[in-house]
Amino acid sequence: MLSYNGEVVKTYYYSTSCGSTTDVTLWGNTTENYPYFVAECVGGVDRGLTLTVESEFNTFIKGENEADYDYDCTLYRWSMEESVKEISEGFARSTGKNVGNIKDIEVLERVNGGAAVKVKVTGDKGETVIDSESAIRAAFGNANVDMNTKSGTTRYANLPSTFCVFEKVTEGKKLTGFKITGGGYGHGIGMSQNAANK
């Protein structure tokens, strides 16, 4: 039984970390209520990056560090590329929000550790904001598109996590799709099951 200051605590776990955990602000709670869940490096190597800053998270998620406990795991890093048609149709189907052909995907907010919790989607028929971890994962996953992982390709209906970045794919000046690069599998709060095996 785990306790904190003499009281039994709630515990959370997930499959695989990207090299960083997050805290309960991911689910809209406060760290004051759950001070024992903290955002920190999984493997003890602090890269000196502020992962709530988009450019610094971009550097983090596109890199790999052999000291990370989950480094050898399949979903430590993953990426997928969806055409404008695929991502737009999948987004409308998953969210019930039709913004038309998606033109831009912008992360508006990341919580401690780097997980995205608010994403603005702009299309040729309007824009909308997706503002929860589970909704973001559902909105951009696609079971019909290959996802590249550390051990080959697979497919997921939902994104493995929101520890990810969105980039436009173009041919010349024409937008043809979006690449999603991410890491980890699960919400990222508490204990990584794969890291616990180390």
Residue ranges of each PLM-predicted region?
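Conserved, single-site charged/polar hotspot
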Residues: M1-K198
